[in-house]
Amino acid sequence: MTLFFQIEYTVRPGELLHVLLSGSYPDGQQWSYNLPMTTADGQHWSLATTVLSQHFRSRRAGRQKTDMLSFGYHYQVEDAEGRVLRREWTVVARRCECRADSRLRFADRWRDVPVTAHL
């Protein structure tokens, strides 16, 4: 399984954009990954990863190999020490369901907190 993430978002020097993936096994145990993205110009970011492939192949702790996997993801800006500086709006989650042989491309836009979110 390969996931391709692309997003256009301008950051300040020293800031990095990350994509956070999260989900859970059928038994309720949760998993998550914080993956740094790469950029050549500080504005166009990308990441190709196979990190979720292990959830299809492994039988860790007696878990059965799964045919389908559901996960959510969002983006955040971090400094060089890993402190979160900005996080996109996550009230409406980005969710995906996929198979082990999936090759998915996510061409996203940053989702700011709406001005009326406090209402």
Regions found by a protein language model. Give the residues of each.
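A short, amphipathic beta-strand motif
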Residues: T2-E8
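Compositionally biased low-complexity segments at domain edges in trafficked proteins
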Residues: S102-L119
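Intrinsically disordered, low-complexity regions enriched for glutamine and histidine
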Residues: F4, D27-G28, T116
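Aromatic-rich carbohydrate-binding modules that target alpha-glucans
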Residues: T10-M68, Q76-S102
